[in-house]
A protein has these predicted regions:
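Post-transcriptional modification and biogenesis factors for structured RNAs
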Residues: 1-192
């Protein structure tokens, strides 16, 4: 039986309303074989908004037995995502140089939470993650972050490459980090 680590909403109209109300939806799951005009409207909306979706077997819906889920579930993010440009503008307006942590292909929620905890202590202005191929912000990620994910702005972008180019154009310096580095991050002046 599927276990959900995030808040879920179910039902075609409820999910459509959440999307139209611009709620933070991480993924929409459709029961395999689902059909109908209303489903087609929802599916078009999901594609138009570029929301991640997946077709899943009936077993995924067992925790919602007895509820009229209509073969549709949506995972809702526990935090609001911020716009990266708005965050950068706010930090610059305070007279500081933004320190944005870009996380690419971090797929384990506990790793994401641990990194966020360290990032908050290191003075990071915001965390930037991709829409796809990334761990979702879940209760496990928040717990591991010791609440840092509630304090740090988290930005989610569809195209990291394009966003990185825009950040460079705005004057931000980029640093890469790896576990094979010769220096620890505290030995580098990242706000120079």
């Amino acid at each position: 039986m599927a276990k959900f680590k995030q808040e879920c909403i179910f039902g075609i109209r409820a999910v459509m309303e959440a999307i139209q109300d611009e709620k933070e939806i991480d993924k929409v799951m459709f029961r395999q074989g689902i059909k109908g005009d209303l489903f087609q409207q929802l599916f078009s909306l999901v594609r138009e908004r570029q929301i991640q979706f997946q077709y899943v077997p009936e077993e995924v819906f067992k925790p919602f037995a007895g509820k009229n889920h209509q073969g549709v579930l949506a995972e809702i993010s526990p935090i609001p995502y911020q716009d990266i440009n708005t965050v950068v503008d706010a930090v610059v307006a305070e007279g500081e140089m933004p320190l944005i942590l870009i996380l690419d292909r971090i797929t384990d929620v506990r790793n994401l939470g641990g990194i966020a905890r360290t990032a908050e202590c290191a003075g990071v202005s915001a965390i930037l993650i991709p829409n796809k191929n990334s761990a979702k912000i879940s209760s496990d990620a928040i717990k591991t972050s010791a609440g840092a994910l509630y304090h740090l702005p988290v930005c989610r972008e569809k195209n990291l490459k394009k966003t990185i180019k825009e950040l460079k154009r705005r004057g931000l310096t980029l640093f890469a980090a790896t576990e094979k580095a010769d220096k620890f991050y505290t030995e580098v002046d990242m706000k120079e």
